[in-house]
């Protein structure tokens, strides 16, 4: 029985929300619309068939036209629906409505024919009254800027357009939806495009916003079909004096759910599957209301990102919990009319599940990022296998197949104001390992399975400090403080020193020159050299490096004491300088359990997850700061001295005044101190003396100066008298600097035999025969040769990256791999005036090393040389020097009879080198103990006239293999100090006397492999095909018995063939001896 208080408008709106509302055009013009049944409770059984037929017709029409979400659920009739809870302010038609209801009740006892006629008359009357309501309400439909503004979605083009403010009829409003493009609307739309569009205007409370979201989301189908009704619904029925009427809206929403569930059989309502699907549908519908309906919160409401601070954040609406109890928006009272107890019980259960899921994941909705938390869903993490500068590796079980895999997690972050070039370069450095592994397929290469990218939602926030442009590392930087997860934005520190705002440098450029977080590792070295007093004075504080045209470190004045002293650390740079194999105290570094040096990838992208424990609860935004409490000063100096990203090569920068800035003289520093200056801003106008750590530049070359590369015009034009407006602008720009953190997951083969490092540390390894050791080394060279044949350089070969699986060596950890086939030179290297004197070999080119490569442009060498098996290499070359260097570096020989080659045989040219496309100065790449001199030196590759530039070949891997071979033959060292000492001497070309006397041929090969001149090193193909077989054959002659089980298949086949030849020779000898006896 329809309640006597039901008003015509409430009936129309109830139909609208269910998705069965007829558009105003249909009501005004179309007479063939199926009629809505409004039967009475007292209908007798004679009317069942007619009711069923009418409902079926109506359902087919509405379901087919509007493509309803719950198409399997019949459109309910209103026979048993109670509209007690719906209120309305419109008084039009109240009496007529009451009369119609009473008429309908009076006709309930009629026969079936009279009932049918009564229904038709009632429906016709409702339609007529609804037309009047629409026409009456259009006169009140004037939405001004002081009230709520609705942006509508054009269902055809998907463009956002704003309704006109003038009063129109429904037909006029619908026809003019696409023609309202005045200047102010365009300006408003353009401004709102970056906010995920808009939601309701000013509502005072949090509950108001939620109810409004429920309302407009439930009217989604209406919103797309007929906008005028939604305007009426919001402006005339639920807003009074521009404020939302919570009571009316709440009762309306209850009726929405009642109508939704009406007519659904009780057995379906009781089923857990239906309740789960129903609640999930509404939960997702309401949670994404802001993003779907294009309504905007007022500036005074900051619940979902409103206000000046969070206006530019398109994802802020997902970070705030909609309700403390969970994310469900349907209250338990909604089900009071339909099995309240069962529904409420199921709702509470799902609510608890949602709470647990939010606590575990703390993630954005999966609809925003499809791969989010894939690792947690599909893998069961067992243990941590190890960690390094490029990330951490975990042993995980895939739930689908039950197999174990090694999952490498590499974290990186991208800022929204980062230049596309820098962002692309960072992504390339992270993804290059995946690209390389996907290309490689070899028995001696770690097998690659899969890789994917996930967003780390709880760490996505803007950088609040003025140092926000300095990119963090690949560290996770996870903070266990739950409070930091509640907001996608973090408020800027109001007490931040204003001087930092003046020290702003270009975000995109400065991020290339200095990368701090993750650039330093914890070490076991003694920590008492410099920082003991510093720790006592400044315990539990962060000391950000400040920006300036300066050459030293300065502690921020805002967090340091006024009586801070200067600490000179220049002598440590000389001590730790490893650029030319000097007498550096390498033993101290080697004993630190950290062979790693931080390359262009590591300092920008990588950080071990062990750093999570070092971060305080407030430090989630402190990726720009160095904690002197937790970090080791020596490690910091070592990283600054060696890492390319920390010590970029600096070309002279031309100043505006016409002077050339020479970094070595320090003339460009604002402090004007000849040999020493501060990274902190030393404001000369205030006469402030630079405070904090100071780095002397007396013994530093131009390429070792810190933080002065890539300075842009913003820094040159900066003055010391910035006003408060500029500071405020800087803060606003910093608050909009959204930083998204991602994690790359790389799924590879898990080797249970651990690594070659574990094997070397086992005392029993010394008991292996030389043949067994050389057989293992042969597998390493085989894998390296395959990598080189694919046009790649590993650049980080070491025992820890050589994995063992059933006695088979597998090369892994391709975090520093360089695909030299995909690079292009962009900078001309320094010229070497000494021609190469290496003889030209005329043997055919080795196909194993025929790879497309690039050469720096010079006057006598073609800028690009493509080497292919089908084309003679000599036809692509125009210089004997280039041909000669290519012979020696690639192991391929060139036959050339061209006159050009002869004519240019004595011409001074640059040696042909591989070019690293990421940076000309690719120094500090790899592992300190095993990296070649050209990798460590900022001077570059050793040539005929000394070092040229940072161009090097794949022979840098041969250098690493030489050190590995030395360790394998020695069989491990007793102490770390002994290992460090011997490797240090080896790098200087010195082998122990006992080693050379016991292993003369191996000693000769090792010294060739670690030659400081890459031209003198053999190629992997030469070692594999020529040099190593000789050593293996000699070892077989020297040893009568060895363990055949530890030999590889090729070595065993070779031994069998030799044994077969010996047996055949003995048989023949025996046969000849028998014939002679006869």
UniProtKB/Swiss-Prot annotation:
Cross-referenced InterPro entries: CC_SR_Kinase, Kinase-like_dom_sf, Prot_kinase_dom, Protein_kinase_ATP_BS, Ser/Thr_kinase_AS
GO molecular function: ATP binding; eukaryotic translation initiation factor 2alpha kinase activity; protein serine kinase activity
Pfam families (UniProt xref): Pkinase
Compositionally biased region (Acidic residues): 480-505, 583-627
Active-site residues annotated for this sequence: 796
EC number from the UniProt entry: 2.7.11.1
Keyword Kinase: yes
Segments forming domain Protein kinase: 379-1031
Residue numbers binding ATP: 385-393, 408
Enzyme class: transferase
Gene Ontology cellular component list: cytoplasm; nucleus
SUPFAM superfamilies with a match to the protein in the record: Protein kinase-like (PK-like)
Transmembrane annotation, as ranges: none
Compositionally biased intervals (Polar residues): 694-707
Region of interest (Disordered), ranges: 31-61, 89-125, 154-190, 460-511, 579-627, 657-737, 823-867
Catalysed transformations (reactions): L-seryl-[protein] + ATP = O-phospho-L-seryl-[protein] + ADP + H(+); L-threonyl-[protein] + ATP = O-phospho-L-threonyl-[protein] + ADP + H(+)
Biological process terms in GO annotation: regulation of translational initiation
Start-end of Low complexity biased regions: 37-59, 89-117, 177-187, 664-687, 709-737
Keywords: ATP-binding, Kinase, Nucleotide-binding, Serine/threonine-protein kinase, Transferase
Family per record: Belongs to the protein kinase superfamily. Ser/Thr protein kinase family. GCN2 subfamily.
Name of the molecule in the record: Probable serine/threonine-protein kinase DDB_G0268642
Organism, scientific name: Dictyostelium discoideum (Social amoeba)
Organism lineage: Eukaryota, Amoebozoa, Evosea, Eumycetozoa, Dictyostelia
């Amino acid at each position: 029985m329809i309640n006597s208080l039901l008003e015509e408008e409430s009936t129309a709106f109830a139909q609208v929300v269910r998705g069965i509302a007829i558009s105003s055009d249909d009501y005004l013009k179309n007479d063939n619309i199926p009629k809505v049944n409004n039967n009475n409770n007292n209908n007798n059984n004679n009317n069942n068939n007619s009711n069923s037929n009418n409902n079926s017709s109506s359902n087919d029409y509405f379901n087919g036209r509007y493509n309803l979400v719950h198409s399997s659920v019949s459109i309910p009739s209103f026979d048993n629906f109670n509209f007690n809870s719906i209120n309305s302010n419109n008084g039009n038609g109240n009496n007529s409505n009451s009369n119609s209801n009473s008429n309908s009740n009076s006709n309930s006892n009629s026969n079936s024919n009279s009932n049918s006629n009564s229904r038709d008359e009632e429906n016709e009357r409702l339609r007529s009254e609804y037309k009047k309501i629409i026409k009456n309400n259009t006169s009140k439909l004037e939405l001004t800027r002081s009230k709520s503004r609705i942006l509508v979605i054009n269902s055809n083009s998907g463009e956002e357009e704003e309704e006109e403010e003038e009063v129109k009829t429904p037909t006029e409003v619908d026809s003019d939806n696409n023609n309202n493009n005045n200047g102010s609307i365009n300006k408003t739309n353009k401004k709102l495009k970056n906010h995920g569009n808009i939601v309701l205007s000013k509502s005072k409370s949090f509950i108001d916003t939620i109810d409004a979201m429920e309302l407009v989301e439930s009217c989604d189908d209406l919103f797309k079909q007929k906008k005028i009704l939604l305007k009426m619904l919001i402006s005339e029925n639920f807003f009074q004096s521009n404020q939302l009427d919570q009571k009316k809206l709440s009762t309306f929403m209850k009726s929405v759910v009642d109508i939704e569930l009406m007519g659904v059989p009780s057995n379906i309502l009781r089923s857990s599957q239906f309740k789960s699907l129903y609640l999930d549908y509404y939960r997702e519908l309401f949670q994404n209301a802001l993003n779907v309906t294009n309504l905007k919160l007022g500036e005074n409401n900051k619940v979902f990102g409103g206000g000046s601070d969070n206006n530019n954040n398109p994802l802020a609406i997902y970070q705030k919990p909609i309700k403390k109890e969970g994310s469900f928006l349907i209250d338990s009272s909604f089900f009071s009319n339909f099995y309240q107890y069962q529904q409420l019980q199921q709702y509470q259960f799902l609510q608890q599940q949602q709470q647990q899921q939010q606590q575990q994941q703390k993630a954005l909705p999966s609809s925003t990022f499809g791969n989010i938390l894939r690792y947690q869903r599909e893998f069961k993490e067992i243990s941590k296998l190890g960690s390094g500068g490029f990330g951490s590796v975990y042993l995980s079980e895939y739930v689908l197949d039950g197999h174990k895999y090694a999952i490498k997690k590499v974290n990186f972050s991208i800022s929204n104001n980062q230049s596309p070039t820098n962002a692309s370069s960072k992504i390339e450095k992270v993804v290059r390992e995946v690209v390389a592994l996907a290309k490689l397929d070899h028995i001696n290469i770690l097998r690659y399975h899969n890789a994917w990218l996930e967003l780390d939602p709880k760490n996505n926030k803007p950088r609040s400090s003025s140092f926000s442009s300095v990119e963090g590392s690949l560290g996770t930087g996870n903070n266990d403080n739950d409070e930091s997860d509640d907001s996608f934005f973090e408020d800027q520190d109001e007490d931040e020193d204003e001087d930092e705002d003046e020290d702003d440098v270009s975000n995109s450029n400065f991020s290339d020159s200095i990368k701090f977080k993750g650039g330093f590792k914890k070490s076991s070295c003694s920590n008492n050299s410099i920082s003991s007093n510093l720790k006592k004075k400044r315990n539990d504080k962060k000391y950000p490096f400040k920006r300036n045209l300066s050459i030293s470190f300065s502690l921020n004045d805002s967090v340091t004491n006024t009586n801070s002293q200067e600490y000179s650390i220049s002598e440590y740079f000389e001590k730790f300088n490893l650029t030319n194999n000097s007498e550096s105290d390498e033993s101290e570094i080697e004993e630190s359990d950290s062979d790693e040096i931080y390359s262009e990838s590591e300092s920008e992208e990588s950080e071990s997850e062990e750093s999570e424990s070092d971060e305080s609860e407030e430090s989630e935004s402190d990726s720009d700061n160095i904690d002197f409490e937790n970090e080791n000063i020596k490690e910091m100096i070592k990283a600054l001295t060696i890492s390319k990203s920390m010590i970029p090569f600096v070309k002279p920068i031309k100043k505006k005044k016409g002077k050339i800035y020479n970094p070595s003289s320090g003339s460009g520093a604002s402090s004007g101190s000849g040999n020493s200056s501060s990274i902190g801003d030393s404001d000369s106008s205030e006469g402030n003396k630079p405070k904090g750590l100071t780095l002397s530049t007396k013994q530093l070359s131009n390429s070792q100066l810190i933080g002065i590369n890539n300075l842009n015009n913003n820094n040159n034009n900066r003055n010391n008298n910035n006003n408060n407006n500029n500071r405020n602008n800087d803060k606003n720009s910093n608050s909009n600097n959204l930083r998204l953190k991602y994690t790359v997951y790389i799924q590879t083969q898990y080797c249970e035999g651990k690594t070659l490092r574990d094997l070397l540390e086992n005392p029993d390894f010394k008991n292996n025969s030389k043949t067994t050791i050389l057989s293992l080394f042969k597998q390493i060279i085989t894998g390296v040769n395959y990598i080189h044949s694919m046009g790649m350089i590993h650049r980080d070969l070491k025992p820890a990256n050589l994995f063992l699986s059933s006695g088979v060596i597998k090369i892994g950890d391709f975090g520093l791999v360089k695909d030299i086939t995909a690079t292009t030179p962009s900078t001309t290297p320094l010229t070497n005036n000494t021609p190469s004197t290496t003889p030209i070999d005329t043997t055919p080119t080795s196909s194993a090393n025929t790879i497309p490569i690039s050469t720096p442009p010079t006057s006598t060498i073609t800028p690009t040389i493509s080497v292919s098996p089908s084309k003679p290499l000599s036809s692509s070359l125009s210089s004997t020097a280039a041909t000669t260097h290519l012979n020696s570096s690639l192991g391929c020989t060139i036959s050339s009879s061209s006159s050009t080659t002869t004519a240019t045989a004595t011409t001074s040219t640059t040696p042909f080198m591989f070019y690293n496309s990421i940076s000309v100065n690719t120094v500090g790449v790899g592992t300190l103990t095993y990296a070649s001199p050209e990798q460590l030196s900022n001077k570059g590759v050793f040539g005929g006239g000394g070092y040229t530039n940072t161009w090097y070949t794949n022979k840098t891997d041969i250098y690493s293999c030489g050190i590995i071979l030395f360790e394998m033959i020695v069989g491990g060292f007793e102490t770390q100090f002994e290992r460090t000492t011997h490797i240090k001497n080896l790098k200087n070309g010195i082998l122990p006397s006992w080693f050379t006397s016991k292993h003369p041929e191996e000693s000769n090969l090792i010294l060739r492999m670690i030659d400081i001149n890459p031209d003198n090193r053999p190629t992997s193909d030469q070692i594999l095909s020529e040099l190593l077989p000789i050593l293996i054959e000699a070892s077989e002659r020297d040893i009568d018995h060895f363990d055949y089980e530890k030999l590889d298949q090729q070595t065993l086949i070779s031994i069998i063939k030799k044994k077969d030849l010996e047996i055949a020779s003995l048989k023949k000898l025996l046969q000849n001896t028998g014939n002679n006896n006869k």
